């Protein structure tokens, strides 16, 4: 069993042995630090995704996409920073006495991730700052495919089509910007 928690904590639990192991990409406790001071920026609910083509391949995301082929015993970074990396939105939050930097306020992260169930190595990443990237070569190169005119927003989910490798759907929200309208996008290329 695999599970994640705030600040990028990722654990693996053996039900048979009743043992838990930390398999975090960046095993650090950044509580109290602003996001710009962290080596990796993880969203409170960061993606943990297994490849539909090979269940020994696992992905997770910070501002980077990470891949493991050994149940998290080691990780390989397969992307650059796929966010806007706006450091003005990565400062410590909270008051002058108590800083509230537990992970939920971390911004400029990859919020959603998917691998095409049709084409092995076609990977989709969406950030909480409104960018969508795709790789068609297993993470070697990434292309920004953010819809033209999309303002800063949170890419809530990307769903790769189960029928066509070039098709994906994205649900986008801007509630943090005072905009409650729904945004839905589809690409076929």
Locations of regions flagged by a protein language model:
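Beta-propeller blade termini and top-face loops
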Residues: 1-189
């Amino acid at each position: 069993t695999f599970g994640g928690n705030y600040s990028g904590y990722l654990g693996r639990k053996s039900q048979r042995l009743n043992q838990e192991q930390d398999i975090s990409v960046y095993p650090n406790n950044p509580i109290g630090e602003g996001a710009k001071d962290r080596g990796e920026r993880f969203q409170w609910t960061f993606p943990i995704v297994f490849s539909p083509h090979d269940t020994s391949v696992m992905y997770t995301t910070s501002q980077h996409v990470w891949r493991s082929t050994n149940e998290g015993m080691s990780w390989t970074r397969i992307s650059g920073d796929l966010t806007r990396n706006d450091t003005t939105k990565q400062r410590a939050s909270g008051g002058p006495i108590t800083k509230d930097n537990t992970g939920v306020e971390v911004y400029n992260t990859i919020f959603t991730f998917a691998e095409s169930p049709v084409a092995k190595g076609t990977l989709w990443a969406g950030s909480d700052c409104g960018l969508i990237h795709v790789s068609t070569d297993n993470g070697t190169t990434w292309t920004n495919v953010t819809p033209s005119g999309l303002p800063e927003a949170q890419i809530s989910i990307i769903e790769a089509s189960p029928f066509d490798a070039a098709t994906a759907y994205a649900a986008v929200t801007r509630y943090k910007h005072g905009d409650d309208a729904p945004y839905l996008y589809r690409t076929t290329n």
